[in-house]
């Protein structure tokens, strides 16, 4: 049977099977959702609608709402620590390294309201989800090692 000019045709979908892109998009939208509404107020169905994916796919990728929340925290801390690592603090004199670290931290927090909101929300939870993440513990451990190194070198 041929389509006539009046027969509706299905539009080609712009969706592609790109799990990494989909997960990155989910994390981006979920970051805003959790930052602005907290864990309790965020809704998976709103995240799904904003990312043109299904709740089922979100649960497939992240396991649960809490799993998505932990992934958001891991991504947020990971971005910060990655930039921090590029400061090459070990190559600088201790006082200058500390100055650069403090300035970076201030500038990062000043320019990343969602990060501050996530930290505040997690503080309300008494660090419950930060404590569950081995990745965040490792990331924050490296930050503590950096400060310890600066102290040992003479700050």
Identify the meaning behind each predicted range.
Residues 72-101, 134, 143, 147:
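Amphipathic alpha-helical linker/stalk segments
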């Amino acid at each position: 049977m041929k389509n006539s000019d009046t027969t509706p045709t299905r539009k080609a979908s712009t969706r592609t099977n790109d799990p990494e892109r989909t997960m990155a998009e989910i994390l981006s939208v979920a970051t805003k959702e959790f930052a602005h509404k907290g864990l309790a107020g965020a809704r998976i169905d709103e995240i799904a609608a904003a990312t043109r994916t299904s709740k089922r796919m979100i649960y497939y990728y992240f396991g649960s709402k809490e799993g998505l929340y932990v992934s958001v925290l891991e991504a947020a801390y990971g971005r910060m620590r990655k930039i921090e690592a590029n400061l090459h603090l070990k190559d600088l004199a201790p006082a200058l390294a500390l100055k650069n670290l403090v300035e970076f931290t201030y500038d990062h927090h000043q320019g990343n309201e969602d990060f501050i909101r996530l930290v505040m929300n997690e503080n309300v939870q008494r660090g419950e989800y930060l404590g569950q993440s081995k990745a965040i513990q490792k990331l924050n451990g490296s930050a503590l090692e950096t400060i310890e190194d600066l102290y040992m070198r003479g700050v």
